[in-house]
UniProtKB/Swiss-Prot annotation:
GO biological process, one term: methylglyoxal catabolic process to D-lactate via S-lactoyl-glutathione
Recorded family membership: Belongs to the metallo-beta-lactamase superfamily. Glyoxalase II family.
Protein's name in the database: Hydroxyacylglutathione hydrolase
Cofactor binding notes: Binds 2 Zn(2+) ions per subunit.
Coiled-coil ranges per UniProt: none
Native species: Erythrobacter litoralis (strain HTCC2594)
Gene name of this polypeptide: gloB
Domain of life: Bacteria
GO MF entries: hydroxyacylglutathione hydrolase activity; metal ion binding
Annotated SMART domains: Lactamase_B
Catalytic activity: an S-(2-hydroxyacyl)glutathione + H2O = a 2-hydroxy carboxylate + glutathione + H(+)
Amino acid sequence: MLEIHQFPCLSDNYGFLLHDPDSGETAAIDTPDGKEYLKQAKAKGWTITHIWNTHWHPDHAGGNKDIVEATGAKVIAPQEVEKLSGIDRVVGHGDTVDIGDFTADVIDVSGHTNGHIAYHLPEAGIAFVGDSVFALGCGRMFEGEPKQFWDSLSRIKALPPETMLYCAHEYTAANARFAVHADPENDALVAYVEEITAKRERDEPTVPTQLKRELATNPFLRADDPALVAKWGGDAPHETFAALRAGKDNF
């Protein structure tokens, strides 16, 4: 069985180490802070053998160099080679990546950046989604277009509903405030926000989050819902998504 070690990193990132006890392999999922990853791996008695980057932003790939120099880890990264260096294998939608006997499917989730990918391990029921989707939110649309981003979110929506989404940031409390503004009549959302508030008061993480719950509460995954279309407009889901994203940007 795969082991996941999650820890806070930088100001609001989460670090993830994915470990296969049988093979001894350990993957660093993104690298906000290489030294912190090495410290956490040492404390667990693990050696980082691979780095799986989701996109090029420094708070996701900035620690690659430190980890590679310390461990010789192999870097697996999306097709953003002009913005990343030292990549051992470039992967894109439809490719697979192995850790021990487990296989991760690479999914195109571009929109936040044009090469953003996620890693879905169906046998383990988990997905590492970077900044594509958050609990009650999604990433800013820095490089992509609304249709592109909505198509990416639709691929996430199509995963098994029990999938646990490992998002890269603790943004949930702020996302919750906009979600309630966007979808105030959603009873499931109101109940979820109460849980989130209690967790954050106890300084507990709200990540991972289950896809099933996000499908019922996350406005960015529900841009095809008639209630949100009526409130936010749009003749197609990606247009409603664009309105929601702009609303969040200015909230």
